[in-house]
Regions:
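Hydrophobic beta-strand scaffold residues
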Residues: 26, 40, 105-107, 148, ...
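Rossmann-fold dinucleotide-binding core
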Residues: 58, 67, 87-166
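Short glycine-aspartate micro-motif
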Residues: 2-5, 81, 106-108, 126
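Rossmann-like NAD(P)-binding element
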Residues: 41-75, 79-90, 125-126
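NAD(P)+-binding Rossmann beta1-loop-alpha1 motif at the extreme N-terminus of oxidoreductases
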Residues: 1-53, 57, 78-79, 115
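Helical "substrate-binding/catalytic lid" subdomain
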Residues: 156-203
Length: 203
């Protein structure tokens, strides 16, 4: 089955390449096609015409809404759209509701792992959507990543990503505050690092 991939930037391009390496035929689209000349590219209408599974990796919710506004009316019913962008929950729910009107399933599946994870196929996918659609897409997640978790219905993937990022942010703030306190107490940072690395403060 030919897979569509919209958004071939720092994350999208290596994800698409891993699908190609696994033997899948892929048709891509990006606003800067010269950056990924090794991936066959065409237009959004062509992708909608030829692909029943279309993955996107876009920079923000506004871009997602604009792309899906063009894409959804062009897709055949039963097409599955898989958005791996990190966007706001409201945008994820909006495109899901619009797609549902056309009998098209949307899965929100933001990732964790960064560019290295995208290149190595070790991403974690936080997935929101219907289980039937997830079951069809899970084998592709397994190619692009090491783990995928169905977190709930539409929008649940983006909700999980926000919570994950909150934990990361709070942890970073805690580490910074601890080292700031160490400096005020004239405690050597390297010695504190050695202690924390093998103690309960390790995170």
């Amino acid at each position: 089955m030919k897979i569509g991939f919209i958004g071939l930037g720092n994350m999208g391009a290596p994800m698409a390449r891993n699908l190609i390496k696994a033997g899948h035929e892929l048709l891509g689209f990006d606003v800067a096609p010269t950056n990924v000349g090794d991936i066959t590219q065409d237009s959004i209408p062509k992708i909608a015409e030829e692909c029943r599974i279309i993955i996107s990796m876009l920079p923000d919710g506004n871009v997602l809404r604009n792309v899906y506004e063009e894409l959804i009316p062009l897709c055949t019913p039963k097409t599955i759209l898989v958005d791996c962008s990190t966007v706001d929950v409201e945008s994820a729910l909006h495109v899901s509701k619009e797609a549902e009107k056309n009998s098209i399933a949307v899965i929100d599946a933001p990732v964790s792992g960064g560019v290295v994870g995208a290149e190595n196929g070790t991403l974690t996918f936080m997935v929101g959507g219907e289980k039937d659609a997830y079951d069809q897409i899970e084998p592709y997640f397994a190619i692009m990543g090491q783990k995928s978790v169905l977190c709930g219905g539409p929008g649940a993937g983006q909700s999980a990503k926000i919570c994950n990022n909150m934990i990361l942010g709070i942890s970073m703030i805690g580490v910074c505050e601890a080292f700031n306190l160490a400096q005020k107490l004239n405690l050597n940072w390297n010695r504190l690092f050695d202690v924390v690395s093998t103690s309960s403060g390790s995170c």
